Structures are given as C-alpha cells and as structure tokens.
A protein has these predicted regions:
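Sec/Tat signal peptide C-region and signal peptidase I cleavage site
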Residues: 23-27
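Catalytic glycan-binding domains that act on GlcNAc-containing polysaccharides
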Residues: 52-265
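N-terminal mature-domain "stem" immediately C-terminal to a signal peptide or N-terminal signal-anchor/transmembrane
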Residues: 29-63
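Bacterial N-terminal signal peptides that target proteins for export
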Residues: 2-13
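Bacterial N-terminal signal peptides
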Residues: 12-22
Length: 265
C-alpha cells in the first residue's frame, strides 16, 4: 500500500471513530441499576425533543424504574423446559378445553377473522390462552415504566428504545396513557402486543378488547407469511409465521400443538 493510501485509510478510520464518539456523546447512556435512570430519562427526552410531543415526553418523565420488570427479565426460565413440562406449567389441557368452548361460542367472530386473514381459530386461541389465560391475566405493571426501564437497561437497549419510541407515538394517538398497565416487558392487551407491534399490526381500537386483539394477532401472522389453508405444524409452511410470534422454540411448538388440538386435528 502506498503512503497516500495508508494516509487515506488512517484519515477515514479517524473520521469513523470521531463520528462514533459523537454519537456516543449524544446518546442517552444505558445502565444496569436504578441509579442512572432519572438522568437517562432527561437525556432521552432531550434527544427526542422536536420529534416527540410535549404530552408524550411528559408521560416519559412520569415513568419510574420498574424493579418488577428487571426481575421478570432476569428470571425467564420456563422457556428452558421441555415441551411437556412447558405445557404442564402453562395449563395446556385447560387451554384446549376452554379454547374449544370459546371457538364454538364465538363462531361468527372466528369465521370473519379467517375469511379476512386466512388464519383459523386454533392458533389464535392457543396464543390467547397462553399469553393471558384468555384475557384473565394481562399484567399489572405500568406499561410506559416497563418499556422505559428496558430501553435504559443495557441488555437490550436498542430493541426497547424502538419500543419506547413506538410507545410515545401511541401516547400521542391516545392508545396508551401514563396509567396503562400490562405485562412486565411492556406487552398490552389480550394477546400481549409490544408497542411497536401495536403500531404495525393493530387493526383499530384497544387491544383490551378481545375481538380487536384477535384481529391484530391474525394480522400479525398474515404479515409474517401465513398462507391460507396451509398447515402450521413444525415443517409446514405456516410454522414460520408462528416463529415470528415468539423466539422460544418451546413456545412455538406449544402454539402449534395446542392450536391443532383446539381445531380438532
């Protein structure tokens, strides 16, 4: 390499380094304890000023560090269970029996969903049952505090920063408020959507309404490649859409198995 080429490379490397450093200076600094959370909120709000509304930034500043969220995030062990153990822990037989009853009781709803999105009742009911026990357990953690805490936490800061930006947009749209409560990671509604999924796949209205949540869930699966009339067991075309719902293999297999039993397959 010539000296000129070497100098160019060195100069380019310095520019890249300085740009990266500038980005680090501007960005709110993550942390793994509560001590830096208030300062992080102020930095985040300052960065977002001009892009987020005063109302949504006020909602952000009203959040508190969620120890319940951090505890839940550090303690996720059920996904390490075998499929049989996981189904026993989640109450698989109850989900199937209740799911079959709800399918019959709401036949018109599920028929309309399948007609629109191509997704049958079984996997939707399996998801609904596993996520919230068919709406019975939707969580009691402040949603904005949960998402802000995980955006601040260093483990998955980038992912949850996206979720926090989506949550602030939902505040502007009147879908979330400072009082909204849900699961420990910021999921809301009957099928536990994170804020970005609410933005991308919500079909209108609150996901605390079961029909709205089920339509949104079917929309999510369709957007992830669900093919009308194709199978959804492992190795079949629609299993990939189920994989988009949850990254844990045991959870994916549970949805497929319970869904097929609810559908009577």
């Amino acid at each position: 390499m010539s000296r000129r080429g070497s100098f160019k490379s060195s100069t380019a490397a310095c520019v890249v380094f300085l740009l990266g450093l500038a980005g680090q200076v501007e960005a709110a600094t993550c942390g793994n304890t509560a001590s830096g959370f208030e300062a992080w909120k102020r930095d985040f709000a300052e960065e977002a000023r001009g892009k987020a509304s005063a109302e949504s930034l006020a909602a952000l500043m009203a959040t508190s560090y969620s120890t319940a969220t951090i505890s839940a995030d550090r303690g996720q062990k059920s996904f390490k269970l075998s499929l049989d153990q996981f189904l026993a822990k989640r109450g698989g037989p109850t989900i199937v029996s209740r799911g079959r009853a709800l399918k019959q009781q709401n036949a018109a709803l599920f028929a309309s969903i399948e007609q629109r999105y191509g997704v049958p009742a079984g996997p939707l009911l399996a998801i609904w049952g596993m996520e919230t026990g068919f709406g019975a357990v939707r969580g009691n953690v402040n949603t904005l505090s949960a998402v802000a805490t995980l955006a601040y936490d260093c483990r998955r800061s980038a992912f949850f920063t996206d979720q926090l930006n989506a949550a602030l947009t939902l505040v502007d749209r009147g879908i979330l408020t400072s009082a909204t409560r849900g699961a420990a990671h910021g999921e809301v509604g009957h099928t536990q959507f994170l804020p970005k999924s609410v933005l991308n796949y919500g079909t209108g209205g609150s996901l605390d309404s079961a029909p709205n949540a089920l339509n949104a869930t079917a929309n999510f699966l369709k957007a992830h490649g669900w093919q009308r009339g194709a199978g959804y067991q492992p190795g079949e075309p629609n299993f990939a859409a189920i994989q988009g719902w949850n990254a844990a293999t045991v959870y994916q297999k549970a949805i497929a198995l319970l869904g097929s039993r609810i559908d009577g397959q």
